[in-house]
């Protein structure tokens, strides 16, 4: 099957750069599956896992939202943070989840609930993706 290059990039640099047969992402508008030769598209992403298939192997990368740019010959994912499943520090992700849950339980006016909810979503996503390795 044909392949195409995929780059997942954060402000700190590239996280994933390989040739794949298919990319699956969760865009704000729904699930997207991208194969070689896909029409050009740009879409905002949800906090989720990016699935990258090549042959019988699937890689998973946790992304904290961002954008996907699809060109017929290349796919680029831009995200504020991204981690491959096998590089996720499970202890750190559990601690982030615990802290976010604690902030959400605090009924104090100074707590930014939207920010705490986003932190919880990112931590849960990282834990879910780490289970996919």
Curated annotation (Swiss-Prot):
A GO BP entry: proton motive force-driven ATP synthesis
First and last residue of the signal peptide: none
Membrane topology: Peripheral membrane protein
Pfam families, alphabetized: ATP-synt_DE, ATP-synt_DE_N
Subcellular location(s) per record: Cell membrane
Domain of life: Bacteria
GO CC aspect terms: plasma membrane; proton-transporting ATP synthase complex
InterPro entries given in the database record: ATP_F1_dsu/esu_C_sf, ATP_synth_F1_dsu/esu, ATP_synth_F1_dsu/esu_N, ATP_synth_F1_esu_C, ATPsynth_dsu/esu_N
Keywords: ATP synthesis, Cell membrane, CF(1), Hydrogen ion transport, Ion transport, Membrane, Transport
Record GO terms (molecular function): ATP binding; proton-transporting ATP synthase activity, rotational mechanism
Recorded family membership: Belongs to the ATPase epsilon chain family.
Assembly information from the UniProt record: F-type ATPases have 2 components, CF(1) - the catalytic core - and CF(0) - the membrane proton channel. CF(1) has five subunits: alpha(3), beta(3), gamma(1), delta(1), epsilon(1). CF(0) has three main subunits: a, b and c.
Function: Produces ATP from ADP in the presence of a proton gradient across the membrane.
Protein name: ATP synthase epsilon chain
């Amino acid at each position: 099957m044909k392949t195409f290059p995929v780059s997942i990039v954060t402000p700190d640099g590239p996280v994933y750069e390989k040739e794949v047969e298919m990319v699956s992402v969760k865009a704000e508008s729904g699930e997207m599956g991208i194969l070689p030769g896909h029409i050009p598209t740009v879409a905002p992403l949800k906090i989720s896992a990016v699935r990258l298939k090549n042959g019988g192997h699937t890689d998973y990368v946790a992304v904290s939202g961002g954008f996907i740019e699809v060109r017929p010959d290349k796919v680029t994912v831009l995200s504020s943070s991204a981690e491959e499943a096998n590089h996720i520090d499970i202890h750190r992700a559990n601690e982030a989840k615990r802290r976010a849950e604690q902030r959400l339980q605090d009924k104090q006016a100074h707590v930014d609930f939207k920010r705490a909810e986003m932190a919880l979503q990112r931590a849960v996503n990282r834990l879910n993706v780490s289970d996919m390795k």
